[in-house]
Amino acid sequence: MVIDKSIPKATAKRLSLYYRIFKRFHADQVEKASSKQIADAMGIDSATVRRDFSYFGELGRRGFGYDVTKLMNFFADLLNDHSTTNVILVGCGNIGRALLHYRFHDRNKMQIAMGFDTDDNALVGTKTADNIPVHGISSVKERIANTDIETAILTVPSIHAQEVTDQLIEVGIKGILSFAPVHLQVPKGVIVQSVDLTSELQTLLYFMNQNHLD
């Protein structure tokens, strides 16, 4: 199957949602799903589904629907969800602590293996209820050495975000999910995905205000 390497970012962001939908269909013993069924489950239109799928070659035949098991496995392969992906979390403040207790592995095969914070943080040396250890950031290099960990969740204050990012890149981190509302400078080959909660809320309020004007 030929996959277009240059898929739009909007399409890429929907990949995990498609995977979730096909897992749900599979659990409900649905064998075939039309683009309309997929679109309705996603809250988008059928044309968007067909356009997204066109980037991945021949996923189904027009008029026959999409094979649910085949597509579930396809997206599992695409998202590397056949094996467990371990990640680290850096910054054990309010957001960080909440994420440490979030059970990622209940839905997908990924889990937080370790948490890190400043060496003087009271949580350092303890474990969460799910047995996730929290270490001092000065030990991050030795802690992830000889592991397959290449991904980090960053929940540190904005003023420290770039410094910590540089430190993580030095120890081999290739992907960062950042909750810091600042632009991070990273070298080629390192991917940063930003989550700006304030921006998302402001966008929501904008659309709500526009809705009131209609």
Swiss-Prot record:
Subcellular localization: Cytoplasm
Binding site for NAD(+): G91, C92, G93, N94, I95, G96
Single GO molecular function: DNA-binding transcription factor activity
Quaternary structure note: Homodimer.
Name of the featured protein: Redox-sensing transcriptional repressor Rex
UniProt organism field: Streptococcus pyogenes serotype M12 (strain MGAS2096)
SMART domains given in the database record: CoA_binding
Alphabetical keyword list: Cytoplasm, DNA-binding, NAD, Repressor, Transcription, Transcription regulation
